[in-house]
Regions:
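Residue-level signal for pocket-adjacent positions within structured domains
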Residues: 45, 159, 166
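Short, flexible beta-strand-to-coil junctions
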Residues: 129-130, 161, 183
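Short hydrophobic beta-strand that contains or immediately precedes a catalytic carboxylate
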Residues: 137
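Surface-exposed beta-strand/loop patches in extracellular or lumenal glycoproteins
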Residues: 140-152
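C-terminal beta-strand-rich structural cap/linker in extracellular carbohydrate-active enzymes
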Residues: 167-183
Length: 183
């Protein structure tokens, strides 16, 4: 699901978001700018009805939801992602399967978390060290990003893209690509 872009402050339920809206307005932002600011950080984003399917009220309720539905619920919903191997839902299932895999469970669940390349902009990167060493990388920008590998890759465990551009000493992550690599 994506965040709901509020069209009016009347759609907002969270009191702290309403307060932030008024702070933004008092600082000189117009209504559209203030709504844009609060839409990004509002706690109501996590409180909107779950988009189960493309039926009325996204399959969430037969009544009136307390918050508005995201208008994209016909395209983005659980039912549309359940059988799509490239969906975010499927990627989460793969993450959970990795966590439960007896070969990696000790490292994923109990391994030491060690930051890696903390200064590289828009990159999430860290090790999980236990009986194995895993490197988790996430590119959080629109452009590809080259990441130096500390050692050769033994195995790519997870990848949210069909391909990975990897060599012995670096990996090129596409925009918003996330991988888990065993070193």
């Amino acid at each position: 699901m994506e965040n709901l872009h509020f069209q009016s402050i009347d759609q907002v339920d969270d009191i702290s978001t309403i307060d932030e809206y008024h702070v933004a307005k008092n600082a000189g932002l117009n209504e559209k700018e203030a709504l844009s600011c609060i839409s990004r950080y509002s706690r109501d984003n996590a409180r909107t009805p779950v988009q189960w399917n493309d039926s009325a009220n996204a399959g969430f309720t037969s009544g009136n939801p307390w918050l508005p539905l995201n208008p994209n619920y016909k395209e983005i919903n659980v039912a549309s992602q359940e059988n799509d191997p490239n969906s975010l839902f499927s990627f989460y299932k793969e993450l959970i399967a990795l966590r439960k895999n007896p070969e990696y469970k000790e490292t994923v669940v109990y391994g030491e978390l060690i930051p890696y390349l903390e200064e590289q902009h828009n990159l999430m990167s860290y090790y999980r060290k236990g009986d194995k060493t895993l490197l988790v990388l996430g590119n959080f920008q629109k452009e590809p990003q080259t990441v130096k590998l500390p050692s050769a890759c033994h195995k790519v465990l997870l990848n949210n893209y069909p391909e990975l551009n990897i060599s012995d000493d670096s990996v090129i992550l596409d925009n918003y690509q996330a991988v888990v690599i065993e070193l």
